[in-house]
Amino acid sequence: MSEPVTPDSRTNENSPSVLQTAAAKNATTVAAKAGVTAPPQVSAADSSSPAALQVSAADSDSLAAAQASAADSDSPADSRARAVNPITEGIIWKQILFFFFPLLLSSFFQQLYNTVDALIVGRIAGKEALSAVGGSAGSVLGIFIMFYVGFSGGAAVLAAQFFGAKKDGALRDAVRTALLISGILGLTGAVLCFGFAHPILAVMHTPDDILAPSLWYLRVVSLGLIPNAVYNMGAAVLRAIGDSRRPLAILIFTCITNIALDFLFVAGLRMGAAGAAAATALCQLLSAVLVLIVLQKTVFTRSSKTAAILAGRILKLGLPLGFAEVMYTFANVVLMAVVNGFGTDTVAAYAAYGKIDALFWMVVGSFGISITTFVGQNIGAGRRDRVMQSIRDCTVMMFLVLGMVIAALYIFAYPLQQLFCADPNVVEIGGRMMRFLMPFYFLYIPIEIMFSALRGMGDSVIPTIITFFGVCVLRSVWGLAVVPLHHTVNMVLLGFPVTWAVTTIAFAIYFSLYLRRQGPAI
């Protein structure tokens, strides 16, 4: 679960860009976020059961049923022992780095094409178009995209466990079933987002001078929600089975394509926010086609089919995490509505901030995916001795790397804002936002560590409840009840560290109790 500080940060926190996708979720992912422009499982066993850290009897039954449903597609070649799996056998800290860097690059390129949208739109079409891309419309899209990111991350846990247990037939059927469900969810989001675009933007008090471009952006990008959901699921599955390089190659290609289309539609044809939206939607379609081709050549090496019993497990694993991601985004939508009341300059600064702080969220998201994948595969392989070591190694690396990221964003706050908009008032507002909030980002790191570890262990129900109250409820109350008492931008921003602190404490208590129930094996 990563939480960008803007609708786009996680790719879109996670966004048309919230592709902060992943074995556990997309960089994402990286567009609804912790908030500045909008801006982060159920288990092999039930999360309330002491057996949640292992493939339980219930899961064993599901595995057996899945195998039976895939029996006709299994062959001796499928069930033979694979080559050594470095995630379950290699030196942990080295393998984490080998797995992490392709993920980070994937998140970087995913966020790059979202950031290029903002750069080109802000510099060529002006602050009104920039506000449309990164303001209310981006926040609304972030709700759907982050749900897809979270859902795919939860479903990918099942893929990681099947892969670690070498259940190839069950893996193929699970992936096909997950892709079908993702397509249905994407269609649902597209219909809702397109059909109710105008009333949604009106409820969010979108300023009149940016309502029209926001409406165009929301409706056009909503057409890409179906391929976005499919891509997120496909990329999450590939990462869950240890392949983080091909999703990276896909993102590099689509990023380059998106930049070219941005220049064509926005700079060349002068289409403004609608042009940026068209470029995003087309590239989402391209990424979905490419990831399906890769899956066809890897996971679907033989015939596979959808399976009702797997659909139930996928929904049980994916829905809690999907809703957890939506909670962050929904809470940020509430704050976005508050920010709209400060005028277009503040909205533009908030949108730019959301693109800049994506650097933090994509690093967080990549580490979170790494934790989930290592924990999930080692549990599936029966290597529970490696679980806590994976978590410890990732924790040390996260604090070291993210400490440098936070320092860099704090120091270069104003120059980074100037990249997006030349208006001095917008730059000043955005720079103050970053300098105020950046020191608090350390509070979020423990949340990502514990949520990702629990997700890999197969526990998502209680973490989702913690997230609901610690983030969604508390942050919404902050925006609606506390901010009006002292109506300033800093008071809006203070809602992020307050909710991070409360959620971190709640996770720490639950995580320690959860591990204690598992005994010394973990």
Task: Cite the ranges covered by each PLM segment.
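Small-residue hotspots at the loop-to-helix junctions and early N-terminal turns
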Residues: 125-139, 214, 218, 277, ...
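Small-residue-rich hydrophobic transmembrane alpha-helices
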Residues: 132-191, 228-247, 350-413, 444-466
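Transmembrane helical elements of multi-pass membrane transporters/channels
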Residues: 98-117, 220, 231, 254, ...
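Short alpha-helical transmembrane segments in multi-pass integral membrane proteins
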Residues: 2-36, 41, 46-48, 54, ...
